[in-house]
């Protein structure tokens, strides 16, 4: 599921922190499966997760200002 910045801006700080932690966990699972010699569930999934994490962090920084 692709996260849009508009939807992220409507979330509270607590929701953003929860989303960030869940995204980091899913990235960790993908990386560990690749490290154990398995193939990722889809080739672009890790890239997508990294970009979603960046979006969440960007919105969190915007809210600090």
Curated annotation (Swiss-Prot):
Key words of the record: Ribonucleoprotein, Ribosomal protein
Chain segments carrying region Disordered: 30-49
Q: Which superkingdom?
A: Archaea
One GO BP = translation
Could you tell me which SUPFAM superfamilies the record lists for this protein? Ribosomal protein L29 (L29p)
Please give the Gene3D superfamilies that the UniProt record associates with this protein.
1.10.287.310
Residue spans making up a coiled coil are none
Q: Name one Pfam family in it.
A: Ribosomal_L29
What GO molecular-function term can you cite, just one?
structural constituent of ribosome
**InterPro entries annotated for this entry?**
Ribosomal_protein_uL29 (IPR050063), Ribosomal_uL29 (IPR001854), Ribosomal_uL29_CS (IPR018254), Ribosomal_uL29_sf (IPR036049)
What are its GO cellular component terms? cytosolic large ribosomal subunit
PROSITE patterns attached to this UniProt entry: RIBOSOMAL_L29 (PS00579)
Name the protein family.
Belongs to the universal ribosomal protein uL29 family.
HAMAP family in the cross-refs: Ribosomal_uL29 (MF_00374)
> What's the protein name?
Large ribosomal subunit protein uL29
Q: Which gene encodes it?
A: rpl29
